[in-house]
Swiss-Prot record:
Keyword rRNA processing in record: no
Lineage of origin: Eukaryota, Viridiplantae, Streptophyta, Embryophyta, Tracheophyta
Organism of this sequence: Draba nemorosa (Woodland whitlowgrass)
Positions with a binding annotation for chlorophyll a B3: M662, Y670
Name of protein: Photosystem I P700 chlorophyll a apoprotein A2
Family, as annotated: Belongs to the PsaA/PsaB family.
Reactions listed under catalytic activity: reduced [plastocyanin] + hnu + oxidized [2Fe-2S]-[ferredoxin] = oxidized [plastocyanin] + reduced [2Fe-2S]-[ferredoxin]
Amino acid sequence: MALRFPRFSQGLAQDPTTRRIWFGIATAHDFESHDDITEERLYQNIFASHFGQLAIIFLWTSGNLFHVAWQGNFETWIQDPLHVRPIAHAIWDPHFGQPAVEAFTRGGALGPVNIAYSGVYQWWYTIGLRTNEDLYTGALFLLFLSALSLIGGWLHLQPKWKPRVSWFKNAESRLNHHLSGLFGVSSLAWTGHLVHVAIPASRGEYVRWNNFLNVLPHPQGLGPLFTGQWNLYAQNPDSSSHLFGTSQGSGTAILTLLGGFHPQTQSLWLTDMAHHHLAIAILFLIAGHMYRTNFGIGHSIKDLLEAHIPPGGRLGRGHKGLYDTINNSIHFQLGLALASLGVITSLVAQHMYSLPAYAFIAQDFTTQAALYTHHQYIAGFIMTGAFAHGAIFFIRDYNPEQNEDNVLARMLDHKEAIISQLSWASLFLGFHTLGLYVHNDVMLAFGTSEKQILIEPIFAQWIQSAHGKTSYGFDVLLSSTNGPAFNAGRSIWLPGWLNAINENSNSLFLTIGPGDFLVHHAIALGLHTTTLILVKGALDARGSKLMPDKKDFGYSFPCDGPGRGGTCDISAWDAFYLAVFWMLNTIGWVTFYWHWKHITLWQGNVSQFNESSTYLMGWLRDYLWLNSSQLINGYNPFGMNSLSVWAWMFLFGHLVWATGFMFLISWRGYWQELIETLAWAHERTPLANLIRWKDKPVALSIVQARLVGLAHFSVGYIFTYAAFLIASTSGKFG
């Protein structure tokens, strides 16, 4: 008999219904559940798949470079980054009529093109790329790396090259190599690139393989390094009149602490960034030599953890048992990695707009909006994933005997206190925030806007003032002009930083008021509720008050009637499913807030945000409705324009989103009956009944339908907002 899909589970392959296909797809990556899996093969499969992941990433980035070099306008854009629109790639579409061809022929192109809102042009320009040839070279190099990764993945599945389990579990060695290799050496290499290529390029000097050995990055070469006169590298920085990419107003410094932004590009000083990466490199190179491996020197992580017994016995046996628990659980490790990566991705979103690193990106408003939104959504998905794998850890890998009375066991012991604490915090935030918004709504509806409850965020304003923002008049710490810290700041550290905070041309420490106070608490509500659902899902994964015997029912049991008190929505899977809706909801509020506040800043009508953001009707009317006018106008009696594609995507996003509800709000029995009816009709229809199928069609399980519904809801939600964001921003600012 020919092997049927899925080959990794012969039990499932025997299933006579369409469940075989769906469950096969669902468990394809759950290596732990596959037939004949051993711990060694599990680790080797995951290791090999990492190489495949890298190959895909390199191929994708190579494609970006290649298409811009082939179909973009990089060399033209460099001549005038503020007015030429960067082209991502050409569009070839046989359906385009003349109006469409005209609408999408932009940026000096000969035919229809897509505009780039990813910031790659600004990034490549900042790091020293200047010609299409540079882009092609980069694309080829990344293609080579992609091939190398694929070969590496294949190689590490061959018998002679398969790593052993002991190698995967050597935590100290892995930590040393990741700290000093991934972070240390790569940061050092990046410093080298910035100093040898990017900084000279910003001063009009073109350094490539043919001349990089005879162009000194600094007039004094390595002299100051070896004589200990490191401060020489910071002397004579670029002046405030420096024209980026030319020698006009440029200096010779390579490692500085200027602070603030380059006046022309509105981005951080390249010499500050080189200095930053050098410091990071040194820190991580030291950190990467701290853990004990072959030589018996350095820290043992197990010893470190076991020494962590808090005084007074308030946390029981502290971190005892954690080393083996974490080191033997891939899900725990993945949970930690995802939690860290999620936080970092959100921080990237926050810092890319407030401290722009790439030349001229701050003046490309649509790109700023797109990058912020993109990174916040990615962060949301990654963070929810962290808790999902935390829940799987408790089900598959947690051993109560091994963790007796340590910090992990104590989390489980008082989980009810944790869950109820999050619960009352969420309820408090929700009712009070909504109460304020609704009160203000009613006051405006009755024409008595002066009766709104408007709360000044004085604590946040005080914190901003302490960091140097003077406009609130608090006169405290760095905003106090006669304080020692302020005066030291003028000369010793980051002299440009305080100026940047008080300039109104950037997004540092934006002025905040009652509207910000309210939306801040709405976002806090979203964050706490999402966290509540996720934490409860993980802590109750093996058993809860309602159903103490969960661990015998696997990871994703369906709704099981009222027998054990009803098991709907109480599996770890269900918690994840519900949390994703709240995550999307929260990030919706975050991105609405960011976008509206910035649109009014960029347009110079900040009072619109300040006055309309204190009541819900203001958000609905003056943000959502007002800014969707371009989308509703994508197609009109006068033909089409360059926003038509976003108008279409806006509609299509709503369609996908609405389709999600067909799976989310329905009864499984209804679908089963519908399927049976269709199958019956098919089998009795001449000609049609010549087509047969082997698998008996059955309705999706409850968990499957929820997944399909959630996927449509998420994709539709993001498509809709992406179209809204890009069209409303590019429609205003070009």
